[in-house]
């Protein structure tokens, strides 16, 4: 339990919007994002390289690309606000950047939900060093 707490504290320091993104993932998939997505495949978690291993990993690749388009924003530190209306995620309030970061996270969380059927436990904690193929471009 202590290790989990330390890991959570470190991750919060890495990405300010991580708590919101994690909550979105949990709400959309029912999975614990810390265990299920933090180091899934070649693109989920910090950084990415090689070829996405499956549809879930491709969600992370697209999410990385989405963040990459926000070059004038700080997607790793900006905190945003969202709520649900009739079950749908609504990105609300805040700056233009915060809303765009929220939209990137929303798209990824929905993508994870839509690809739950192809999620493979073998790609959890998949070492990025195993992702040696030529990397995709956004």
Curated annotation (Swiss-Prot):
It is an enzyme of class 3 (hydrolase). Ca(2+) binds at residues 43, 45, 47, 64. It is found in: Secreted. Expressed by the venom gland. One of its GO terms (molecular function) is phospholipid binding. InterPro entries: PLipase_A2, PLipase_A2_Asp_AS, PLipase_A2_dom, PLipase_A2_dom_sf, PLipase_A2_His_AS. It comes from Craspedocephalus puniceus (Flat-nosed pitviper). The active site is at residues 63, 105. Keywords: Blood coagulation cascade inhibiting toxin, Disulfide bond, Hemostasis impairing toxin, Hydrolase, Lipid degradation, Lipid metabolism, Metal-binding, Platelet aggregation inhibiting toxin, Secreted, Signal, Toxin. Its cofactor is Ca(2+). Snake venom phospholipase A2 (PLA2) that impairs hemostasis. It weakly inhibits ADP-induced platelet aggregation when tested on platelet rich plasma from human and rabbit blood (15-25% of inhibition at 5-10 ug of enzyme), and dose-dependently inhibits blood coagulation, possibly by inhibiting thrombin activation. Also induces local edema a few hours after injection in the hind foot. Exhibits high hydrolytic activities toward L-dipalmitoyl phosphatidylcholine. PLA2 catalyzes the calcium-dependent hydrolysis of the 2-acyl groups in 3-sn-phosphoglycerides. One of its GO terms (biological process) is phospholipid metabolic process. Belongs to the phospholipase A2 family. Group II subfamily. D49 sub-subfamily. Its EC number is 3.1.1.4. Residues 1-16 form the signal peptide. Monomer. The keyword Secreted applies. Disulfide bonds join 42-131, 44-60, 59-111, 65-138, 66-104, 73-97, 91-102. Binds 1 Ca(2+) ion. It comes from the Eukaryota. It catalyses: a 1,2-diacyl-sn-glycero-3-phosphocholine + H2O = a 1-acyl-sn-glycero-3-phosphocholine + a fatty acid + H(+). One of its GO terms (cellular component) is extracellular region. This is Basic phospholipase A2 Tpu-G6D49.
